[in-house]
């Protein structure tokens, strides 16, 4: 009996290793308010100005949210530029984020536009590629 217990103990210790542990990140890690922080163009990082950093993506538990953009105008200063509704989902590796424009521009009714982004959370930043060599980096509040 002692030999069987010893064999089972050794088998248990040998069969488990750190490599077998898989870190699973929850899909709701994105929930909260993420402010514009930095952006990257051609592998060069730059910091958004104070006005742009007031803007954010807000992700809610129900898969909806808002994108809020501020713009610094030399005449009027830092002003709210746009607010868009969004929907988000998580496929296990990246976030699918869709923003929807309100269907008007400068008071003129037009068709609505949907923008689609794919983002990943890395080093406490939500990184969203937005162009060929461009990425916006948002930091959670």
Label each region the model flagged.
Residues 17-85, 89-141:
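Lipid interaction determinants
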Residues 1-4, 17-18:
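Positively charged n-region of N-terminal signal peptides that target proteins for export
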């Amino acid at each position: 009996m002692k030999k069987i217990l010893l064999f089972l103990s050794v088998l248990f210790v040998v069969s488990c290793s750190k490599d077998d542990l898989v870190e699973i990140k929850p899909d709701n890690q994105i929930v909260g308010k993420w402010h514009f922080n930095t952006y990257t163009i051609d592998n060069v990082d730059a910091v958004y100005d104070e006005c742009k950093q007031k803007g954010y993506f807000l992700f809610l538990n129900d898969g909806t949210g808002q994108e809020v953009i501020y713009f610094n105008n030399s005449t009027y200063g830092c002003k709210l530029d746009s607010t868009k509704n969004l929907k988000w989902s998580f496929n296990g590796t990246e976030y699918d984020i869709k923003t929807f424009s309100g269907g008007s521009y400068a008071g003129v009714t037009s068709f609505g536009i949907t923008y689609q982004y794919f983002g990943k959370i890395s080093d406490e930043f939500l990184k969203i590629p937005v162009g060929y060599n461009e990425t916006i980096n948002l930091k959670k509040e």
